[in-house]
């Protein structure tokens, strides 16, 4: 996977997939992700991202078969705060957040996605990766945007709903995602 746009510096960012936040992938005829939106905020450009890094599809049924490279970070929770994603440390290894990593060339775009601009660089080895595909495609350091205060209250496991993730081909086809497949994005929250 090459750096989107060529020579600009790219940082890989962990984006948790949580309830009440939408994630829209726009896919071209060559099965490349051309645009990515998190709650309507563009993250990218993502012109060189291959669709199968994130999901496998059955084109005959216009349906997602599997999500790939789902990153899991332990000891944190995620909530939606003022239409942005807020992550906090709990230091409890039972708490976890799942999501994707995306390349970003413009860190200012992340101000519209995350409630905190406190960036922490984390080794890829600190994550569990579900359905790993294309080993070595991501940089060894991933940035996580997390608040400075630790959450010490009770947590619960939450699931995302249908239409949280939208995958649309430039031909107007929207890939269906079976409800049971969304269970891979369970996460800890308040």
From Swiss-Prot:
Keyword tRNA-binding included in the entry's annotation: no
InterPro entries the record matches: CRISPR_Cmr7_comp
The keyword Calcium is assigned to this record: no
Pfam families: Cmr7b-like (PF22392)
GO biological process, one term: defense response to virus
Keywords: Antiviral defense
Top-level taxon in the UniProt lineage: Archaea
Entry coiled-coil feature ranges: none
Biological function: CRISPR (clustered regularly interspaced short palindromic repeat) is an adaptive immune system that provides protection against mobile genetic elements (viruses, transposable elements and conjugative plasmids). CRISPR clusters contain spacers, sequences complementary to antecedent mobile elements, and target invading nucleic acids. CRISPR clusters are transcribed and processed into CRISPR RNA (crRNA).
Family recorded in the similarity comment: Belongs to the CRISPR system Cmr7 family.
Subunit structure: Homodimer.
Protein name: Putative CRISPR system CMR subunit Cmr7 2
Organism annotation: Saccharolobus solfataricus (strain ATCC 35092 / DSM 1617 / JCM 11322 / P2)
């Amino acid at each position: 996977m090459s750096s989107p746009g060529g020579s600009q510096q790219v940082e890989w960012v962990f984006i948790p997939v949580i309830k009440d936040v939408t994630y829209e992938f726009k896919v071209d005829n060559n099965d490349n992700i051309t645009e990515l939106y998190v709650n309507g905020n563009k993250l990218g450009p993502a012109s060189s991202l291959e669709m199968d890094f994130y999901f496998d599809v059955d084109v005959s049924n216009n349906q997602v078969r599997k999500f790939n490279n789902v990153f899991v970070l332990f000891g944190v929770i995620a909530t939606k705060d003022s239409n942005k994603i807020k992550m906090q440390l709990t230091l409890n290894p039972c708490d976890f957040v799942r999501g994707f990593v995306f390349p970003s060339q413009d860190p200012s775009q992340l101000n519209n996605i995350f409630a905190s601009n406190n960036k922490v660089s984390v080794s890829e080895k600190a994550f569990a990766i579900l359905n790993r595909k294309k080993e070595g495609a991501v940089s060894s350091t991933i940035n996580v945007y997390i608040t400075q205060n630790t959450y010490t209250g009770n947590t619960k496991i939450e699931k995302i709903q249908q239409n949280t993730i939208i995958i649309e081909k430039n031909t107007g086809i929207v890939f269906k995602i079976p409800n049971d497949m969304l269970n891979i994005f369970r996460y800890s929250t308040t």
